[in-house]
Amino acid sequence: MTKKVAIILSNEFEDIELTSPKEAIEEAGFETEIIGDTANAEVVGKHGEKVIVDVSIADAKPEDYDGLLIPGGFSPDHLRGDAEGRYGTFAKYFTKNDVPAFAICHGPQILIDTDDLNGRTLTAVLNVRKDLSNAGANVVDESVVVDKNIVTSRTPDDLDDFNREIVKQLQA
């Protein structure tokens, strides 16, 4: 059975932080599904990239996926604003069950809501690092960081390293 990666997304995502990893995942032979507030709704990136949500967060089951991708931009902030905390709960399945979770730029913000960062080593864009540290993470300034099943990266400049590690983790 082909491995499938969930991508949680809202408006104002950083376009290249969605399109580049998604392309790398699919080129490696894996499937992706966009998960958002409403199935079949359009979400628009900061630079105009438009994508359609495949599955609503209400209907998504994390156990149906072999990995989780969280692109950056302002999308993670919007997702964290979900009154029911559904995106953090969804992500927690991956962090708690050693299923790969990939987050770049502002994406690691979602991982804060898993309450599973204490002692984990992560990276992120500069203005998210303090929040990660306050959540108990050991924060470093590296292009890509792997801590067990969590893979984090800083910015679009690091996408080559990030994409390579995503594919490596999915092929393991």
Curated annotation (Swiss-Prot):
Protein name, entry field: Uncharacterized protein SH1084
UniProt signal peptide: none
Domain PfpI endopeptidase: 3-171
Superkingdom of the organism of origin: Bacteria
InterPro entries on file: C56_PfpI-like, Class_I_gatase-like, DJ-1/PfpI
NCBIfam families membership: PfpI
UniProt record similarity statement: Belongs to the peptidase C56 family.
